Amino acid sequence: MEISGLVYLIIIVTIIDLPYGKANNYCKIKCLKGGVHTACKYGSLKPNCGNKVVVSYGLTKQEKQDILKEHNDFRQKVARGLETRGNPGPQPPAKNMKNLVWNDELAYVAQVWANQCQYGHDTCRDVAKYQVGQNVALTGSTAAKYENPVNLVKMWENEVKDYNPKKKFSENNFIKIGHYTQMVWANTKEIGCGSMKYTENKWHYHYLVCNYGPSGNFGNEELYQTK
């Protein structure tokens, strides 16, 4: 990366350097969609953002707790039949939707991907015990401020307004509702997320990646069992 003039760049690292990259041989994992595993291809938590300027990466302990709480609060809202939005709403209550728990391995793989500063889904992120789903969100501003990660999670929640519970999951418009459906997928038990803040062309970006296991969004299944 070449930067003209004299620039003092301080990169703040808020994530613990987890041992999973060394403890697990991700290069042996074969994902259903094919491709090289993210943690094998990139190999570490070192940012690889090209001409983008890294401001900070990783999540604090409090941010992890807040993201997990936001997911579980929303899941319980839907499960209790309190989500009135939809196309049409309300969303039916669920009888098999449990709270998620944080998984550090999912978080590690999510952080490796976030550290590439490439908005979008990676190809292969599965872990040994299950297939892994993924939600991504990116916000940008010309002001030197970065969105709270919980607000990025709420962007996924807002997709519920386009979900039609009277249709099968596969009959809904996945592009409009896929983040919401992964959030409330009943068979998903664990979550782990990574975060990257960077600047490019005077814009300030916050990129959030959350990985979910077991993965949701299978076309022949339903989000959850209704009461």
Curated annotation (Swiss-Prot):
InterPro entries: Allrgn_V5/Tpx1_CS (IPR018244), CAP_dom (IPR014044), CAP_sf (IPR035940), CRISP-related (IPR001283), V5_allergen-like (IPR002413). Keywords: Allergen, Disulfide bond, Secreted, Signal. It holds the Pfam family CAP. Residues 68-212 form the SCP domain. GO terms for cellular component: extracellular region. Transmembrane segments: none annotated. Gene3D superfamilies: CAP. SMART domains: SCP. Residues 1-23 form the signal peptide. PANTHER family: CYSTEINE-RICH SECRETORY PROTEIN-RELATED. This is Venom allergen 5. It comes from Vespula maculifrons (Eastern yellow jacket).
